[in-house]
């Protein structure tokens, strides 16, 4: 990206990582591995319940239905109840996206900057991008964000191989 000062927010299927970078140096890091309710797994579960793709789910951010369940595993019963109450699919999808954003926002609020870079599979969620753009002056999504962790591992492995002098045969 060429940026020296930014917040990297990596939202994967099972965990969330926040990295603060100042002048090109990592100055702080936090991660959440305790709960999948703030991760891609939650979006996948809810998309399955609503019988939409995660890509379709991500399109909706307007008029979200209020969802209070904080557990990715048990939130399906709340959604079924909202469907029975007559909530529209678009409102339910927006509700899922907003509930994810609501869970992520306190986690990232302790890391403030003008630039936010989203990585991990959830970075492709258009609604999340919209919500975060209200909090940051600039929101960027990495190219192929779902592979960012794997790309980093490969890059690190290549660097380590060069440092310890392993030749390629």
Model-inferred region functions:
Residues 23-63, 68-71, 155:
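Glycine-rich phosphate-binding loop plus the immediately following alpha-helix
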Residues 9-13, 31-38, 95-98, 140-150:
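Active-site nucleophile and cofactor-binding loops and adjacent substrate-binding regions
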Residues 1-9, 17-24, 105, 152-159:
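Conserved phosphate-binding catalytic cores of ATP/NTP-utilizing and phosphoryl-transfer enzymes
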Residues 10-15, 120-122:
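A short acidic Gly-Thr/Ser loop motif
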Residues 108-135, 146-149:
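Glycine-rich phosphate-binding loops at beta-strand->alpha-helix junctions
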């Amino acid at each position: 990206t060429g940026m020296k000062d930014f917040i990297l927010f990596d939202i994967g299927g099972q965990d969330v990582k926040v990295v603060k970078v100042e002048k090109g140096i990592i100055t702080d890091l936090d991660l959440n591995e305790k709960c999948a309710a703030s991760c891609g797994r939650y979006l996948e579960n809810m998309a399955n319940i609503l019988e939409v793709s995660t890509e379709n789910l991500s399109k909706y951010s307007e008029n979200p239905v209020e969802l209070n369940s904080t557990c990715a595993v048990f939130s399906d019963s709340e959604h079924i109840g909202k469907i029975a109450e007559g909530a529209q699919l678009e409102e339910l999808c927006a509700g899922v996206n907003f509930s994810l954003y609501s869970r992520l926002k306190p986690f990232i609020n302790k890391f403030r900057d003008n630039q936010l870079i989203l990585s991990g599979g959830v970075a492709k969620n258009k609604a999340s991008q919209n919500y975060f753009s209200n909090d940051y002056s600039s929101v960027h999504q990495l190219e192929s964000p779902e592979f960012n962790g794997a790309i980093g591992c490969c890059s690190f492995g290549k660097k380590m191989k060069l440092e310890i002098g392993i030749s390629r045969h």
